[in-house]
Amino acid sequence: MSKPPPKPVKPGQVKVFRALYTFEPRTPDELYFEEGDILYIADMSDTNWWKGTCKGKTGLIPSNYVAEQAESIDNPLHEAAKRGNLSWLRECLENRVGVNGLDKAGSTALYWGCHGGHKDVVDMLLAQPNIELNQQNKLGDTALHAAAWKGYADIVELLLVKGARTDLRNNEKKLALDMATNAQCASLLKKKQAQGIVRTSSNADEYLDDEDSD
């Protein structure tokens, strides 16, 4: 029995597959790929021929071939971040895989990069212009919660420099500081929170007479 066809791509959304077999093109427009290659499908508007990219080359792929001879990768950016696979992460971003996509747990790729302590992955994700730093997953945890819980002070520092919020509580009402498992992480978070308190009080004095203030 053949598998049901994959759901069509929404505009701006990229579907990712891993080829199970090598495909030999019959025309110059078709895309050559080998078993195990990652395929990025950006255009499924033609039901018979999908436009895809593999190893930086773009071409047409028969849709029935992808449906039957390739396995769908639902959250490729998350997988790359979990594994600390920087080259795959870069390829996903170059092929416009959404940087803030959520997996079934409601977590972002940034969360998993922080959870795994993959500093180079976190660096690359934080360099994306529209990265969402403070996304909370189904447990209410942010990337900062994950880094603090796992004790990665270097990643905690990266997130704080980028502007991650320290005041978000998870479903257990815990701040990232409450989950910090080592003194270095706790110290960084306490320092940041103290700065926030000082800034808030000084702003109140500074803008007391400002009509634009809330």
From Swiss-Prot:
SUPFAM superfamilies: Ankyrin repeat (SSF48403), SH3-domain (SSF50044). GO terms for cellular component: cytoplasm. The keyword Lipid biosynthesis does not apply. Signal peptide: none annotated. Pfam families: Ank, Ank_2, SH3_1. Induces bone resorption, acting probably through a signaling cascade which results in the secretion of factor(s) enhancing osteoclast formation and activity. This is Osteoclast-stimulating factor 1. The lineage of its organism: Eukaryota, Metazoa, Chordata, Craniata, Vertebrata.
